[in-house]
Every structure is written in structure tokens, then in C-alpha cells.
């Protein structure tokens, strides 16, 4: 019995790993655009990036993490923005949401909007909300929706929901699903 459970666990892990590395299409631009772009997301975790090489490798769009919570600006935000813009890449911004209430979500949207206010975004703004702590499904959806609505209100820009495949299929529901979905592909470094 233990061998069967162990084998089943391995099969499940391999299936999940395969799902996370499958290519997906992203609608980072408006629905009137049928063109598909190759893109990446970047943050301070990647260190110094040669965006000229990135462009030469066929990447057309770079989503840059600008902020997290209500007071953290990504350590490479300004540098990534300038270098990606200088390389002629299309740019989008994303914010890593840490809110645990609607009030906090709205404050995070205000912070995100203020951080990117002097920058030019070629793509929709993105909400990256993936660390839920003890929140239940209803709370997650309420907080995510509050963030996206407040962000749209403040910026007059469309928003996309950045999510992994598991969360997209099991957590997001209701009004949140009216927003376009950008499925993350963790572990893809080509």
C-alpha cells in the first residue's frame, strides 16, 4: 500500500510540474489586439538584467514588479524600467498583493498607482496575489476584487490577474473572473 501511495504521489507531482511549465498565451494588451507577444516578468530577484540580450532572444514584453504591500518598492524597479525602455521593449507593471482585508487591498492599490504614476505602461497593470495565509476563498476573491477595482479607478487603466494554474482553477471566481488571466509559468528560464 505504501508503494502505491508513493507512486501516486510521484505521478501527481510530475503532473503538476508539467502543468506549470506548459506554454500559455497572455492577453496583456486590450482585447482588440490579436497579436501574441513573447514576454517575461522580472523583479529584484533576477539581479541585473541585460535587456538588450532579452530583446535579442525574442522577448517583446517585460512585466516589471514595481511594488509589494503598502511600502515596498522593488529594489530593481527603476533600473529595470529604464533598461527595458532603452532596449525598446513593451512594458507592463505588476504589484505583489499582501493584503488581508479590503481596506488594506485599497491602500495597496493606491501605493501601486503612486509608484508607477510617472511611468509609461504599454500593457495592462497586473495584480499578483498568491500568498493567502489563512484567508478563505470568499475573502481572497473579495480582497482581490477590491484591489483591482480601486486600481482601475485610480489609474483609468485595465487590469489583468496574474495567477498560477492551480489558483486560477480553484480559487478565483465570481466578479474576479471578468478580468483577463495571465497564467504564471514558474521555472521557465529560456
Predicted feature residues:
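Acidic-and-aromatic substrate-binding clefts and catalytic sites of carbohydrate-active enzymes
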Residues: 40-50, 66-77, 98-107, 133-138, ...
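Mid-chain, structured segments of secreted extracytoplasmic proteins
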Residues: 81-106
Amino acid at each position: 500500500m505504501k508503494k502505491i501511495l508513493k507512486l501516486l504521489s510521484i505521478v501527481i507531482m510530475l503532473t503538476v510540474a508539467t502543468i506549470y511549465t506548459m506554454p500559455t498565451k497572455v492577453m496583456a494588451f486590450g482585447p482588440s489586439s490579436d497579436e501574441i507577444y513573447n514576454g517575461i516578468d522580472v523583479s529584484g530577484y533576477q539581479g541585473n538584467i541585460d535587456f538588450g540580450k532579452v530583446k535579442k532572444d525574442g522577448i517583446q514584453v517585460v512585466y516589471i514588479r514595481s511594488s509589494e504591500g503598502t511600502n515596498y518598492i522593488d529594489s530593481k524597479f527603476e533600473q529595470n524600467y529604464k533598461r527595458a525602455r532603452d532596449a525598446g521593449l513593451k512594458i507592463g507593471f505588476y504589484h505583489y498583493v499582501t493584503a488581508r482585508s479590503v481596506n488594506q487591498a485599497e491602500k495597496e492599490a493606491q501605493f501601486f498607482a503612486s509608484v508607477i504614476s510617472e511611468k509609461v505602461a504599454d500593457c495592462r497593470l497586473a495584480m499578483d496575489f498568491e500568498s493567502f495565509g489563512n484567508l478563505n476563498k470568499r475573502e481572497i476573491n473579495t480582497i482581490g476584487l477590491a484591489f483591482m477595482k480601486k486600481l482601475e479607478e485610480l489609474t483609468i487603466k485595465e487590469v489583468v490577474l496574474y495567477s498560477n494554474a492551480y489558483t486560477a482553477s480553484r480559487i478565483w471566481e465570481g466578479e474576479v473572473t471578468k478580468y483577463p488571466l495571465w497564467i504564471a509559468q514558474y521555472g521557465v528560464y529560456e
